[in-house]
Amino acid sequence: MSPFEGGDGIDVWITEACTNIKTFERDELFDLLATETRVWWAELFEAQSEAIDKLTSIMNEAATTQDGCLEFGQKGAQRISIRGKRIYAYQLVYWVGNALLPSAQDVVRHKCHNRRCINPSHLTHGSQADNRLDELERRS
């Protein structure tokens, strides 16, 4: 169960994210699958305090909606800058919070269909094809 669903809130989730990111280690598989993007994410995970500070900042700036979404930004999916790169806030929340290195095919999906949402319990990952199927289901 997500800490948000259990009512414990952002602080518990941030603590969980800290635990997850501290367990990150590069291994032989990382070396075999290394790309420029994966190396960038690995370096972000290794800069733990910077990653967690940015994560905490955006989580605390988000506003809760009636649907339980944590909306960050005014219009559309909000981009943030970190370590010289611009990424979507929801990507930072999902990949850093779970200490998962995305591959080129991985995307963060919104179960709530709200691209402004950064609520970790509303986010999951999959492929671009999964994302398209989500959109078709939402429209039907």
Regions from the PLM with identified roles:
Residues 2-107, 114-140:
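Conserved recognition-core residues within compact binding domains
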